[in-house]
UniProtKB/Swiss-Prot annotation:
NCBIfam families: metH, PRK09490.1. L-homocysteine is bound via the zinc atom. Pathway: Amino-acid biosynthesis; L-methionine biosynthesis via de novo pathway; L-methionine from L-homocysteine (MetH route): step 1/1. It comes from the Eukaryota. Residues 360-621 form the Pterin-binding domain. Pfam families: B12-binding, B12-binding_2, Met_synt_B12, Pterin_bind, S-methyl_trans. Catalyzes the transfer of a methyl group from methyl-cobalamin to homocysteine, yielding enzyme-bound cob(I)alamin and methionine. Subsequently, remethylates the cofactor using methyltetrahydrofolate. This is Probable methionine synthase. One of its GO terms (cellular component) is cytosol. Residues 652-749 form the B12-binding N-terminal domain. SMART domains: B12-binding_2.
């Protein structure tokens, strides 16, 4: 492969001065006012399609015009002109049926530009250069043109490679100096173009010439149309070896600056920047003047951001001339030496850096058909939606790279790999991280590489089939731009011992770096982690062999990385999860020290090395390093003596009572022991030599203890129930000190005339559940955790009007406001509070939390209404991080910058999704409704019609129906697979012990609540004749037959495959038969929360938050259990359509019964206003169950809904709906469209602002 001398020539000029590229070709063509015949010319005079607008044809039909435009730009000062070939591929020309002219278009365009450059160069004595313009085409590899089929693509990678190759070849034949791949909105398309160009250089003998690459950031999110950040775009395309990289189009110069700045820091190439002349005006024109644009780009130049500047849409020779003059004498940017030297760069939608300072990189392992039976079954059954959820869980659990393997004999591997990767590309929360394409079939690897826009890892290749095959595959991987995993495997087989492992890796490294030209930082060696303790002596050193091989690789093969499957080491102890997890921790401790920097491991299940019991640690290290031939047997014995979570049972002791008072207070706080805290606090207070003031006791020993609690919770070494118990201890101590502090305050007022204005807290947080919402368990937990972390919390309770929140914030001089809500109407109330905070002039941060909230809603709907920090807090620990970061002036600015950038990304992604989302027309969805053959259906008549009440129900009967998993979720105790559900959670290595403690507490409290009749459970059930009409369900008076009311339905409108029905609840109710209803609908409401609120207030007055949260959580579980019990009674007795049902409690919780009970305001009918009809028909208030103005149920521990008996009825989610359905729904309900939009805002598929 020969190399053009232009590299050195252009590099020298770009180091001396800022170079200029031309402006818009299309803008100048429009000024010529050409007609259809200009585009046809003689060659296309009889063409069967209109051609006006196909500007590339003008290089053939009107070359005089194109030459004139080139010359004007060159005379204005341009160093480079672009050929008139933006749409010069067979793919783009297919729209005009001009594919047959592609070679001529490109060849003639290059000749015209070449002649203009040569003519002006000769006249001015300054050489000019031709850039062969290669546009993005009108198709994209990363985005489906069909919303209904997100895996569909209307072009393949290889089709693009051929089209780009043909174009580049013709441009080169016409005499271009540079190939410019521009306006890249999808990095996958750019990768195809670069692949084609590298193929020309490396396989066809075309001399290598400079390549420029310019992406397009579509808006202020800083992302391309396909979702990548500018930095990720650079990483994805680095294999193309661009001499210059940068941005053009979409944005004006001012808006483009921050993104050019980022690229300038990231890239060691020259930086090119040619923005639009501002943003389009209402008429599609561009208003930024040459002087305005030149002034901005002059600042780019002065700040050392650019090497080449020019213009895109709306720019003219006058703009280029102004730029040329503006940068005269300014020293160009000096490209940095490789800013990421010694690091591996990968990318998904975002860049990922693996280097010396990077923590161990966790590779998610569950998207592997060979390693996960569940994932394999999902793929075989074409259940890709759920398979994507598996990937999402991996990312949410901390995977930094997603391993995907489709190697199964019953699968079409290339098809499955392509489909899965294409699907996850439309899931930003998954696609943000890089993919590891894992297969032993190279065709599957190629399919994967051609289905993702990021820089991937290929897993794997080896010397197993010899050097030639190894080099062939390595060169292909390199051309695609991926990193590679190399197995320690050669022609003789898999290496087990240290020296063979290293020898194979060293040989592979030499071939890759010296013969293939691989970047050593893109090489990952899997040095084979093999199982120890198998009973075979030759296996006993396998752990040491790997660790020593890792050390040798990192010390002797610069840049290379070491990876492996960690769980292999402990396979002989399968079934003993606590032992396995501890063994993984010990193995990684030493392997990472030796140089292993990435691997497949369940990081969430690793105990901290220092926390492993010393006797166990000794046994594990003896086993790992083969120091004791009986280590395996000893470990098996130890396992029998251990608790299932791998830790020795605690022994009770009162030795701590002999410690100093400070140590006793700390112990009480950390352990949650309140028995002696008042006495110990008083002892500390009386030591006035050490603590002159009561406040000093809070500031020092008590806060010191809570600091330990906060640290342990943040590190995952304490769990939420323990933290809440600690808070209870703290509150009791502070309550004891408050009267003494008040006496001191009054004394100060009398002697000094004023009270001291001081606080021991980090800050003050006013927190409330918003108006209309009664749910507060999550809010209460946040209050406790914030209090444990030295924040003063002013809790305003539930159903708090906006004016009360703002008033409290002003009176308390709050540093933060926190809003909580569970039901969707609360989202609108939060928007209103934000607006009011802005109106009254507050400038403190606003925290948003609760089950119905999301980062997207916060960023899109709330944040724009309040020009100060607005932060979505996912859970209690997140709120601490947010408040602490915003309180610490040393990190506040950086935190806010990251937050603002993140929320801007979220906003832009949201608006982009609205543009791209496609909906089925409402009438067509009704044609595709779920159809039941009503002629063959006979409804079962209930045992009674009308209304029936159930008062003061025996709670003991509900205990078997309790679903305990949500209970543990309240306490943020989440087991890891396979110990997620109850009772398996008790076996979880991390949370099992604490879950058992909380569960035992719950049993004690359940008994107390029932025995003392603290809680009361009531319910009301009704069965009414019913008939469907379209999407609605009418209910009738059982005596008169008159229509009583209507339940209105919403129908699925998006996300359905062509053969899938579009569900609506009315599909499960029979229409009128001969004008008479011939079916039934059930209605119910139940509660187990009567009495809970009053009792919890008493507990909170006694500073017992733990008990208060426990009571509310149990009331909630009992209410759900009551709903489950009632539904069983309905099925088997009250309605009696399933009299022979014989299901276990587990079957009930798994919904294995006939019929459904959807709730208003939830997925099958997301409209909360339907509760008004339900309440009117049930007269639920008579049973003590009410509705707030925002339609939350009161008490909070209440459940309501409808009963459907049809055997074909099933749960479904309506999902997003379009405006046509909203208009239709509003008309049917006879309410304003705006009111419907307010209540249905979370499911609207369009923006109402």
């Amino acid at each position: 492969m020969t190399r053009s001398s232009l590299f050195e020539e252009l590099a020298e000029i770009a180091k001396e001065r800022i170079m200029i590229i031309d402006g818009a070709m299309g803008t100048m063509i429009q000024r010529e006012y050409m007609e259809e015949e200009d585009f046809r010319g003689e060659i296309l005079k009889d063409h069967d399609k209109p051609l006006k607008g196909n500007n590339d044809l003008l290089s053939i039909t009107r070359p005089d015009i194109i030459y004139k435009i080139h010359k004007l730009y060159l005379e204005a000062g341009a160093d480079f002109v672009e050929t008139n070939t933006f749409s010069g591929t067979t793919i783009a020309q297919a729209d005009y049926r001009c594919e047959h002219l592609v070679h001529e278009i490109n060849y003639q365009s290059a000749l015209v530009a070449r002649r203009a450059c040569d003519d002006v160069g000769a006249a001015t004595g300054r050489r000019r250069y031709v850039c062969g313009a290669i546009g993005p085409t009108n198709r994209t590899l990363s985005i489906s043109p069909s919303v209904e089929k997100p895996d569909f693509r209307n072009v393949t990678f290889q089709e693009l490679v051929k089209a780009y190759g043909d174009q580049a070849r013709s441009l080169i034949q016409g005499g271009v100096d540079v190939l410019l791949v521009e306006t890249v909105f999808d990095s996958a398309n750019a990768k195809a173009a670069l692949f084609a160009i590298r193929t020309l250089f490396e396989d066809e003998g075309v001399p290598e010439m400079p390549v420029f690459l310019s992406g397009t950031i579509v808006d202020m999110s800083g992302r391309t149309l396909s979702g990548q950040t500018g930095e990720a775009f650079l990483v994805s395309t680095k294999q193309g070896k661009p001499m210059a990289v940068g941005l053009n189009c979409a944005l004006g110069a001012k808006d483009m600056r921050q993104f050019v700045d980022n690229m300038s820091k990231w890239s060691d190439s020259f930086i090119i920047c040619y923005p639009n002349a501002g943003l389009p005006n209402a008429l599609g024109g561009y208003d930024e003047t040459p002087e305005e644009m030149a002034d901005v780009l002059r600042e780019f130049a002065r700040d050392g951001l650019v090497n080449i500047i020019g213009g895109c849409c709306g720019t003219t020779p006058d703009h280029i001339n102004a730029m040329y003059k503006a940068v005269q004498g300014i020293t160009p940017r000096v490209p940095p030496q490789d800013p990421h030297a010694g690091k591996m760069l990968l990318s998904g939608l975002e860049p990922s850096i693996v280097g010396p300072e990077t923590n161990f990189v966790n590779i998610g392992e569950r998207c592997n058909v060979a390693g996960s039976r569940r994932f394999c079954n999902l793929i075989k059954n074409e259940n890709y939606d759920t398979a994507i959820d598996v990937a999402r869980v991996q990312v949410d659990s901390g995977a930094q790279i997603l391993d995907v393997n489709m190697d199964d004999g019953l699968l079409d591997g290339p098809y499955a790999m392509s489909k899965f990767l294409r699907l996850i590309s439309s899931e930003p929360d998954v696609a943000k991280i890089p993919v590891c394409i894992d297969s032993s079939d190279f065709d599957v690897i190629i399919a994967g590489l051609e289905s993702t826009q990021g820089k991937c890892v290929v897993n794997s290749i080896s010397l197993k089939e010899g050097e030639e095959k190894f080099k062939e595959r390595a060169r292909i991987i390199k051309r695609y731009g991926a990193a590679v995993v190399v197995m320690a495997f050669d022609e003789q087989g898999q290496a087990a011992e240290t020296d063979p492992k290293f020898e194979i890796c060293e040989r592979s490294y030499r071939i890759l770096t010296e013969e293939v030209g691989f970047n050593p930082n893109d090489i990952i060696f899997d040095a084979n982690i093999l199982t120890i303790a198998t009973g075979m002596e030759e296996h006993s050193n396998y752990g040491m062999y790997f660790i020593e091989a890792a050390r040798m690789i990192r010390e002797n093969l610069p840049g290379a990385h070491v990876s492996g499957g960690v769980s292999n080491i402990s396979f002989s102890f399968r079934g003993m999860e606590a032992i396995r997890e501890a063994m993984h921790s010990v193995f990684l401790f030493y392997a990472i020290k030796a140089g292993m920097d990435m691997g497949i491991v369940n990081a969430g299940a690793l105990p901290v090395y220092e926390d492993i019991d010393k006797p166990l640690l000794q046994l594990l290290e003896d086993l790992l390093f083969n120091r004791d031939p009986e280590a395996t047997e000893k470990l098996l014995v130890a396992a029998q003596e251990m608790k299932k979570d791998g830790k020795k049972a605690d022994t009770k002791t009162d030795e701590w009572r002999s410690l100093t008072v400070e140590e006793r207070l700390k112990f009480a706080l950390v352990k949650g022991v309140d028995q002696f805290v008042v006495a110990d606090t008083e002892e500390a207070r009386q030591n006035t030599a050490k603590y002159p003031r009561p406040l000093n006791v809070i500031e020092r020993p008590l806060m010191d203890g809570m600091a330990v609690v906060g640290e342990l919770f943040g590190a995952g070494k304490m769990f939420l129930p323990q933290v809440i118990k600690s808070a209870r201890v703290m509150k009791k101590a502070v309550a004891h000190l408050l009267p003494f502090m008040e006496i001191e305050r009054q004394a100060n007022i009398e002697t000094m005339g004023l009270a001291e204005d001081e606080s021991p807290y980090q800050g003050t947080v006013v927190i409330a559940t918003v108006k209309g919402d009664v749910h507060d368990i999550g809010k209460n937990i946040v209050s406790v955790v914030l209090g444990c972390n030295n924040f003063k919390v002013v809790d305003l309770g539930v159903m708090t009007p906006c004016e009360n929140i703002i008033k409290a914030a002003i009176e308390e001089k709050a540093d933060f406001i926190g809003l909580s809500g569970l039901i969707t109407p609360s989202l609108d109330e939060m928007v209103y509070v934000a607006k009011e905070m802005n109106r009254v002039g507050l400038n403190i941060p606003l925290l948003i939390g609760g089950a119905t909230t999301s980062k997207t809603h916060t960023a899109v709907k709330i944040s724009p209404r309040y020009p100060h920090p607005v932060v979505h807090c996912l859970d209690a620990s997140k709120s601490v991080v947010v408040c602490s970061s915003l309180s610490d002036m040393s990190v506040r600015d950086a935190f806010l910058q990251d937050l603002n950038e993140d929320y801007e990304d979220v906003r832009q992604e949201h608006y982009a999704s609205l543009k791209d989302r496609r909906f089925t027309d409402l009438n067509k969805t009704r044609e595709k409704k779920f159809k039941i053959d009503w002629d063959k259906f006979t409804a079962v008549k209930p045992s009674f019609v009308g209304r029936r009440e159930y008062q003061n129900f025996d709670l003991n009967e509900l205990i078997p129906y309790i679903d305990w998993k949500p209970f543990f979720d309240v306490w943020q105790l989440r087991g890891k697979y396979p110990n997620r559900s109850y009772p398996k959670i008790f076996d979880d290595a991390d949370v099992g012990a604490e879950a058992k403690k909380v569960f035992d507490d719950a049993q004690t409290w359940l008994k107390k609540l029932i025995d003392e009749k603290i809680l009361v459970a009531n319910a009301v059930v009704s069965f009414l004749p019913a008939a469907s009409e379209g999407d609605d369900m009418h209910v009738y008076d059982p005596e008169t037959g008159n229509k009583l009311d209507t339940f209105y339905g919403l129908r699925q409108q998006s996300g359905r495959e062509h053969d899938q029905p579009h569900f609506c609840l009315s599909d499960f109710i029979k229409p009128l038969k001969n004008g008479v209803p011939d079916d039934y609908l059930g209605l119910f409401a139940c509660t187990a929360g009567l009495g809970a609120e009053e009792y919890c207030k008493t507990l909170e007055k006694n500073h017992d938050d733990y008990a208060s949260i426990m009571v509310k959580a149990l009331a909630d579980r009992l209410a759900e259990a009551y709903a489950e019990y009632l539904h069983k009674e309905v099925r088997t007795t009250l309605w009696g359509y399933s009299t022979n049902e014989d299901l276990t409690e587990s079957d009930l919780l798994s919904i294995k019964y006939q019929g459904i009970r959807p709730a208003c305001g939830y997925p099958s009918q997301p409209d909360h206003t339907e509760k008004r009809t339900l309440w009117k028909l049930l007269e639920a208030e008579k049973n003590g169950i009410g509705l707030t103005e925002h339609l939350a149920m009161l008490p909070a521990a209440s459940v309501s809904g409808l009963y459907f008996a049809n055997p074909q009825s099933e749960y479904f989610a309506v999902g997003k709906i379009d405006q046509d359905q909203v208009i239709d729904y509003a008309a049917r309900k006879n309410v304003p469209k705006e009111e419907v939009e307010r209540w249905l805002s979370p499911i609207l598929g369009y923006d109402t602002d």
